[in-house]
């Protein structure tokens, strides 16, 4: 049976007695903060694929646009939580490195001692729906409370779910709650947004129209609140970041 070493400074109490100007007082021992970033990362639910994502290992390959995007995301993380907006929204096509940069920002923020949670949009909604109780008209409270209450939430692939009224109502309630309470939200999306400068297209397959804008997939209210609280960064780069990164191995 292993035993955990007791701090020699505080004897395991977490507090030490200090004297300043002949006045005694207590302050937190450094043992409470040592390793805090590591503990926060263990609880963050970041997928193994992105667990080591950082600004240092993001491959820009000399592309100025990617350098500018990384610089903007890094600035958000470095100035957190005193930046102009509590949230960050990364818009770009699949494979543009959005998730890597979002996780890099979250990890940098956690290094400062803030708690963060990663969740995939579709998985989150599926978890909430799976726990839905029609008799009480309530959903999976654990998953729902997590995204409402977490200090910093990273929501990956925002809008990547079949559109229904329930989906739009759920994402609206989450975004609105976090916006009203100034709880930081980092989000990524493949969906274009005309007002963010994206080209928007409508695709049709087998006679069915598929909606391809952020507004149509999450609704007007959620989109409005999202843009209100977030610094919006659009990534226009055609080469797949995953393929480009793979060439390095």
Model-derived segments and spans:
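A short, basic N-terminal segment
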Residues: 1-68, 237, 243-249
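Walker A/P-loop nucleotide-binding motif
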Residues: 84-102
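Loop/turn-to-beta-strand initiation segments
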Residues: 114-115, 149-152, 181-187
């Amino acid at each position: 049976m292993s035993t955990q070493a007791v701090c020699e400074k505080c004897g395991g109490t977490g507090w030490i007695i200090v004297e300043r100007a002949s006045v005694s007082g207590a302050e937190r021992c450094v043992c409470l903060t040592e390793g805090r970033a590591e503990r926060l990362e263990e609880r963050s639910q970041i997928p193994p694929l992105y667990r080591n994502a950082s600004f240092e290992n993001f491959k820009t390959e000399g592309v100025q646009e990617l350098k500018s995007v990384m610089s903007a995301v890094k600035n958000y993380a470095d100035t957190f939580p005193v930046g102009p907006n509590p949230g960050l929204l990364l818009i770009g096509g699949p494979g543009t490195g959005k998730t890597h940069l979002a996780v890099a920002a979250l990890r940098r923020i956690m290094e400062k001692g803030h708690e963060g949670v990663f969740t995939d949009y579709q998985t989150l909604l599926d978890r909430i729906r799976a726990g839905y109780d029609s008799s009480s008209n309530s959903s999976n409270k654990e998953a729902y409370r997590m995204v409402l209450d977490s200090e910093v939430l990273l929501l990956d692939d925002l809008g990547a779910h079949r559109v229904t009224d329930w989906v739009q109502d759920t994402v609206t309630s989450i975004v609105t709650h976090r916006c009203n309470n100034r709880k930081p939200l980092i989000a990524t999306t493949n969906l274009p947004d005309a007002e963010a400068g994206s080209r928007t297209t409508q695709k049709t397959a087998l006679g069915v129209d598929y909606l391809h804008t952020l507004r149509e997939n999450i609704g007007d209210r959620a989109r409005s609140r999202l843009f209100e609280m977030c610094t919006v960064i659009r990534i226009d780069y055609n080469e797949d970041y995953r393929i480009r990164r793979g060439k390095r191995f």
